[in-house]
């Protein structure tokens, strides 16, 4: 079935449709970054087929008891809205709440009964064990045996969803029949979105939009096709005072100690190439240990940061790097600077813009490794890493991305450069490239039986001249849209 209102998400739609056609009960968990479109996907695919929906609310309560009762009240009101009798007693705990849900569903005579529990981490609350235990009992004792139930749980707190639902070792252990991790749009999906919403942007502008908003549907929905991209960025980031709250909202509610998470994200935002665990812990003033590891795991699972190996002269270091485009833009241009109408038009010709664009374009490329792999005709990437070593003159050389394909005994050294026009390699940069190649060939990381390919990844291609002779392959912005 075609869904004209949904861009991309083809595999996810197929899964949801299969669950609906199944001859048994299905228990599905959907997770992903806040604003990525999880609720929208379920509501569009299942439309009028949802029998009951409850949504958790992020609230600040004085104590756990009042927090739980507020969520129970909302759950009860959702039952009333769905058609449960008005004289039904209000639940005081989760066992009673799920008993009411069972009673309501038993009175529904349809082929499939779809239950959608949205923002489950908020619904369950900080002390979530009771709610999760009762959800497990509801599924194990009744819903699973009905054979016509589709139970969908959804949450933006990815690490919570993994710990309490997907990898749970209690009552939900082994009960899930399907999981969906919803990712941001790719460049190609963003292009489809823009075209379907009446935008006529160049691919260069689409890339700049991606570098500002990421592939986050909620942010793209805020753009106005009657305005230029510059005007839209001004309106979204520089004129709307709510932008500061939106940045906090990405993290508030996802984690119990959101301030700690914000400290780490802001610190990483000041170091584009990232920091080691030790460097990061020292910078934010937190001890190395289980709590710190959990925070990093949570941010990684939520798609906010990435971890990658950086090969140096003596050892391999694990580096943590901010990868959330919205957060990167906010921290570079907005945080602590206030808002000023028209700022983006001014900034686009400043060194600050080119610094941000150069760094962020590298992240855009890394986030589109499958497209790079396809262009380079690489069957298998055995390793991808950052390399740092000493050049012949003693200076430190860095190759931001090395792709290793053992099957062809080839290492692809990728240089990523952002430019509005064709990128020109001059005499000085040719010399730098030669030094990088020499240093890499003589490093411990280079397998001596491997050949190398110098790959330039640019927006508009490399301008042909006498200094570009060492470039073996090129990847352009058009290739990343595939």
Residues of each region from the PLM?
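A cross-kingdom feature that marks ATP-driven nucleic-acid transaction machinery
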Residues: 5, 311, 318-482
């Amino acid at each position: 079935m075609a869904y004209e209102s949904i861009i991309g998400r083809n595999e996810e739609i197929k899964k949801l449709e299969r669950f609906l056609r199944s001859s048994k009960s299905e228990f599905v968990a959907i997770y992903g970054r806040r604003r990525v479109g999880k609720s929208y996907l379920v509501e569009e695919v299942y439309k009028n087929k949802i029998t009951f929906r409850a949504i958790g609310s992020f609230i600040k309560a004085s104590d756990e008891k009042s927090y739980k009762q507020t969520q129970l009240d909302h759950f009860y009101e959702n039952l009333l809205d769905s058609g449960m009798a008005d004289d039904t007693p209000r639940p005081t705990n989760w066992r009673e709440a799920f008993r009411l849900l069972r009673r309501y569903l038993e009175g529904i005579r349809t082929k499939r009964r779809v239950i959608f529990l949205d923002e489950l981490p908020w619904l369950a609350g900080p002390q979530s064990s009771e709610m999760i235990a009762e959800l497990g009992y509801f599924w194990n004792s009744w819903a699973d045996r009905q054979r016509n139930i589709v139970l969908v749980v959804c949450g933006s707190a990815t690490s919570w969803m993994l710990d309490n639902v997907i990898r749970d070792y209690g009552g939900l252990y082994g009960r899930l029949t399907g999981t969906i991790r919803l990712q941001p749009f790719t460049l190609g999906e963003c292009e489809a979105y823009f075209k379907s919403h009446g935008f006529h942007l160049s691919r260069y502008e689409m890339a700049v939009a991606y570098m500002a908003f990421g592939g986050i549907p909620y942010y793209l929905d805020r753009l106005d096709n009657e305005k230029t991209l510059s005007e839209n960025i001004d309106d979204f980031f520089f004129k709307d005072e709510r932008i500061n709250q939106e940045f906090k909202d990405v993290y508030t509610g996802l984690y119990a100690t959101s301030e700690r998470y914000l400290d780490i994200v802001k610190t990483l935002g000041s170091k584009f190439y990232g920091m080691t665990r030790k460097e990061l812990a020292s910078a934010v003033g937190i001890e190395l240990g289980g709590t710190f590891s959990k925070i990093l795991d949570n941010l990684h699972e939520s798609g906010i940061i990435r971890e990658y190996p950086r090969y140096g002269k003596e050892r391999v270091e694990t580096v943590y790097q901010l990868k959330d485009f919205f957060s990167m833009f906010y921290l570079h241009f907005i945080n602590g600077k206030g808002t000023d109408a028209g700022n983006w038009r001014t900034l686009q010709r400043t060194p600050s813009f080119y610094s941000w664009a150069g760094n962020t374009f590298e992240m855009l490329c890394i986030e589109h490794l499958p497209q790079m792999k396809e262009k380079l005709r690489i069957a298998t990437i055995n390793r991808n890493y950052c390399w740092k070593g000493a050049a012949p003159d003693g200076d430190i050389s860095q190759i931001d991305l090395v792709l290793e394909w053992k099957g062809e005994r080839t290492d692809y050294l990728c240089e990523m450069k952002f430019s509005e026009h064709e990128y020109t390699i001059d005499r000085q940069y040719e010399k730098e490239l030669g030094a990088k190649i020499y240093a890499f060939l003589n490093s411990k990381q280079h397998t001596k039986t491997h050949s190398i390919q110098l790959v330039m990844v640019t927006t508009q291609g490399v301008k042909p001249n006498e200094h570009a002779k060492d470039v073996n392959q090129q990847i352009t912005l058009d290739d990343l849209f595939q």
